[in-house]
Amino acid sequence: MEKKFYLVREDVLPEAMKKVVLAKQLLERKKAASVAEAAQLANISRGVFYKYRDAIFPFQAVTKENIVTLFFHLEDRSGTLSQLLGVVAAAGCNVLTIHQTIPLQGRANVTLSVSTNDMNEEIDELLAKLKQLEFVEKVEIVGSGVY
């Protein structure tokens, strides 16, 4: 029998399925040493984990190439782009393109396109870290796609 796949928003998924995804991420990132530990940390039974583990995947896990384009409005200070790229690299993103405008009135715009295939954290976590940088006035996702 051929299996059909559906793209479903997270907010309509049963809680058990969300927790299975969490348990799988804990195992993948080596935050749990065993299925039993991952299930316990995710607050599900091992039975639930085994029932759904091969049935639910994060969207980015089944795509070939996930590219996100980020827009930044930065204060013009020495080393800001380097520091920003360091945070992006630490998240496991591969920078594909960089476009920086000439600074005007102490501000510059930067657009980055990054591959998120090898990210070691969620995109929301990366955005939160980038927003915490003192020279970042604005950061937003302006595009994303699967290629």
UniProtKB/Swiss-Prot annotation:
Disulphide bridges: none
Organism superkingdom: Bacteria
UniProt domain ACT: residue ranges: 69-144
Pfam families attached to this UniProt entry: ACT (PF01842)
Family named by the database record: Belongs to the UPF0735 family.
Protein name in the entry: UPF0735 ACT domain-containing protein GK2605
